[in-house]
Amino acid sequence: MSFRSQTSSTTSMRPVSSYSSRSISLHRSVPLGSSASVVGGAGGHGARISSGGFGLASGYSSGSSFSMSVKGSGLFNNEKETMQILNDRLASYLETVRNLEQANSKLELQIRETLEKRGPTTQDYSAYEKVVEDLKSQIYDMTVNNARLVLQIDNARLATDDFRVKYESELAIRQSVESDIIGLRKVIDDTNINRMNLETDIESLKEELIFIKRSHQTDVEELRKHISECGVQVDVDAPKGQDLSKIMEEIRAQYETIIQKNREELKDWHNSQILIVETEVKENTEALQKSRTEVTELRRQFQTLEIDIESLRTMKASLEANLHDVEMRNNMEMEGFNFIIRQQEADLQQLRTSIQAQVHEYQALLNIKMKLEAEIATYRRLLDGEDFRLQDALAVQTTKVQKKITVTETVVDGKVVSQSSEVQEIKK
């Protein structure tokens, strides 16, 4: 971003006779009954002054001055000598004018050389801008890396939370499976106790059956023995009674069938229960082993993530320390750059002040030049033989000079990188 500012100043030259520091005065007085005349010439050129008294004086601030006076109450006796003196004074005056013009030209040349010499030094900030851009790019890259690390840490934290939730759910499942296994073990124990009780009942029933068989056999033998000893034969005209032994055999067969059936049913039920329990135990054992494997894997992943998080934290701390160091170095370099900029601005302000002083000096010299030109013109008219008052001539010749000073400044990002000035004179 650049802009230009122009500053214009207009200087109007008033009539020469109005300046107090440099004055040209011409007094003419003609007393009663007196007359004066001066006639002279140099190189075929003459001038006539008719006055009773004549005086001319001029001075200027540079230290060079001349004065010319012609006094008399009558006619001059030596006109050529008087004109020679006037010509010498005029030549000295013109020499002074030429010296002032040369000094003015030298001053303008010095102003241009100063502007050309100091101009490029104030606008060469390319090296500083490159360093600043490099530092800005480094800061931006470190900021992006820091943001990336923060994002990775957040992702790792979310993954850790997810694994923790999975671990807790798997732990709850493991605990429930272990409680189910404990319950199944209790069921197995109860089943074993019932089986042992049933086996005990079977043994007792077998013993009771053997005892009943023996008792029945004893009773039958005793009954047969008693019948044989009695030797009584009784014939009864009645239907033949049932054979008790046959009945006992049938009862025994029925009981054995029932016992065998119950034994087979109990055995089948016991085998089925054992098979179910073994299947459940096998499934629960497999699930428990799988859960243990998953828990081990999750624990390993959790430890790996903890190690990664710790390494990321260490990297983050080191990057923050590096960023702090870079910021400190950047601040120090920026302070140095600001000091250089302030120094350059002070030099620029001093240059502006110097230019302004030189402009004022140039304006003063220009005023002197204009006044001298007016006085030279007046002398020429006097030498040409014109007889009039100098004040009237100076009053008629009013020269107006408009002086335009253009100061151009190029500002980039609030910094003055170049400056130039241009002086224009417009006579009206």
From Swiss-Prot:
SMART domains: Filament (SM01391). Residues 132-223 are annotated as: Coil 1B. Residues 79-114 are annotated as: Coil 1A. Residues 248-385 are annotated as: Coil 2. Residues 79-390 form the IF rod domain. Keywords: Coiled coil, Intermediate filament, Keratin, Phosphoprotein. SUPFAM superfamilies: Intermediate filament protein, coiled coil region. Residues 224-247 are annotated as: Linker 12. Residues 2-78 are annotated as: Head. GO terms for cellular component: keratin filament. GO terms for molecular function: structural molecule activity. The record marks 237-238 as: Cleavage. InterPro entries: IF_conserved, IF_rod_dom, Keratin_I. It holds the Pfam family Filament. GO terms for biological process: intermediate filament cytoskeleton organization. Residues 386-428 are annotated as: Tail. Residues 115-131 are annotated as: Linker 1. Phosphorylated. The keyword Protein transport does not apply. It comes from the Eukaryota. Heterotetramer of two type I and two type II keratins. Keratin-18 associates with keratin-8. When phosphorylated, plays a role in filament reorganization. PANTHER family: INTERMEDIATE FILAMENT, KERATIN, TYPE I CYTOSKELETAL 18. Belongs to the intermediate filament family. This is Keratin, type I cytoskeletal 18-A. The lineage of its organism: Eukaryota, Metazoa, Chordata, Craniata, Vertebrata.
